[in-house]
């Protein structure tokens, strides 16, 4: 990969210059009062993006460190968990549950297809589960499941906690954490938040804190025990704060500087405007792809605002396609996963790349590679169709670029 390639993969994402510049600071000790206040402010901003009043816990590492910490903090040996699978990434939760001595029971749904709530309801009625998990935005299929709130209600009706993997949706798709009553909502820096790889976070409900504190068998995970980060009373209050959030481990200071700036950009744009921008650019990209005679893997009503999985025409190998895309057009992205590893590519349109310039450039490059591989289509069809989508949107409201 070259330094001037455009990252159109489903994470990591390109990073705005503002965010990169925010890290260019002298070394600082994370336990100073000054940094503690910065830490608190950053987590308050993150809670706004989560749309929650719950406490958000930052976990150093990738998104998987957040998933593992959340699960190991609540699951004890022998506990049952219902794991909803609608793509590759749901399986991670099952592995973690089993790894700490729990019993994961998977319920599988076809990639890119609707969930059958009746199946989930029947499964929950068959036994006692401590936890239900699912992925909000399945990066492997390009499907977003806004039915997560309905799944949360089913979980709570049967006495279970609800964990939502929002790794590739937070900051790019509407995620009403409190309205859906999500108990453990996991995300990370390097997807739609558009900050550097290295931090995950978990928004934790009071219900989940109570389960952690009521464990019969203590959490064996020292690093990932979320109770280390539980807010403690601050007496006397400082600057109006009555609680202090401890740092369970030393915070990655410069990653926090970057995260703070990325969150500042999100809140400056406004959540509603940001979600609309992602939806528009995702629509333009998908319509362009369809104009080439291709169909995204996810059905239209589940189409993700942050990532699209595109099965290639018969006989075209993903590895060859991606090589042409990068070497000849400077677009770096990733192949499909699971059964689509060799036959599909995935394009991320999130964060700073969810803009017309990146979408149109990527569509032009995909057209050129398909033509080189002998796929028949009307030249310019993808770019022209995407431009039509943007033009139609302009009549409603101008398309806004993202400041760098």
What is each stretch, according to the model?
Residues 178-190:
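Conserved active-site segment immediately N-terminal to the catalytic lysine
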Residues 53-82, 86, 90-95:
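Conserved beta-loop-alpha segment that forms the PLP phosphate-binding cup at the N-terminus of a helix
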Residues 295-328:
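Conserved PLP-binding catalytic core of the aspartate aminotransferase-like
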Residues 4-60:
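A glycine-/small-polar-enriched, mobile loop at the entrance of the PLP active site in fold-type I
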Residues 115-171, 184, 192:
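Active-site phosphate-binding strand-loop segment of PLP-dependent enzymes
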Residues 14-15, 190-287, 291:
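Active-site C-terminal subdomain of aminotransferase-like
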Residues 339, 343-404:
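PLP-dependent enzyme catalytic core of the Aspartate aminotransferase-like
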């Amino acid at each position: 990969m070259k330094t001037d390639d455009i990252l159109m993969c489903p994470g990591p994402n390109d990073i705005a210059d503002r965010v990169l510049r925010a890290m260019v600071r002298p070394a600082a000790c994370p336990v100073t009062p000054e940094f503690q206040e910065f830490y608190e402010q950053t987590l308050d901003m993150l809670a706004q993006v989560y749309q929650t009043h719950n406490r958000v816990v930052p976990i150093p590492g990738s998104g998987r460190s957040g998933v593992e910490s959340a699960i190991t903090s609540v699951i004890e040996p022998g506990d049952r968990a219902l794991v909803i699978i609608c793509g590759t990434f749901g399986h991670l939760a099952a592995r973690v549950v089993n790894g700490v001595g729990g019993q994961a029971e998977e319920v599988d749904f076809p990639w890119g297809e609707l969930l059958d709530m009746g199946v989930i309801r029947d499964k929950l009625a068959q036994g006692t589960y401590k936890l239900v998990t699912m992925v909000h935005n399945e990066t492997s299929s390009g499907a977003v499941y806004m039915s997560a709130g309905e799944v949360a209600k089913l979980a709570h009706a049967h006495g279970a906690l609800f964990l939502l993997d929002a790794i590739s949706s937070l900051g790019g798709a509407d995620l009403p954490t409190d309205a859906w009553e999500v108990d453990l909502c996991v995300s990370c820096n390097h997807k739609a938040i558009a900050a550097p790889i290295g931090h995950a976070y978990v928004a934790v409900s009071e219900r989940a804190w109570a389960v952690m504190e009521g464990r019969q068998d203590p959490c064996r995970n020292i690093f990932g025990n979320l109770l280390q980060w539980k807010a403690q009373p601050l007496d006397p209050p400082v600057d109006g704060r009555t609680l202090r959030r401890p740092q369970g481990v030393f915070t990655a200071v410069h990653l926090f500087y970057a995260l703070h700036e990325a969150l500042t950009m999100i809140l400056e744009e406004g959540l509603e405007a940001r979600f609309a921008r992602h939806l528009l650019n995702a629509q333009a990209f998908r319509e362009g792809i369809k104009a080439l005679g291709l169909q995204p893997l996810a059905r239209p009503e589940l189409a993700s605002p942050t990532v699209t999985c595109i099965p290639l025409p018969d006989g075209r190998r993903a590895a060859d396609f991606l090589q042409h895309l990068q070497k000849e057009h400077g677009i770096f992205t990733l192949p499909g996963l699971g059964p689509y590893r060799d036959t599909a590519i995935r394009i991320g349109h999130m964060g700073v790349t969810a803009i017309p310039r990146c979408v149109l450039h990527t569509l032009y490059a995909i057209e050129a590679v398909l033509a080189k591989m002998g796929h028949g289509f009307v030249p310019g069809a993808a770019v022209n169709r995407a431009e039509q989508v943007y033009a139609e949107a302009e009549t409603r409201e101008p398309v806004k670029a993202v400041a760098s």
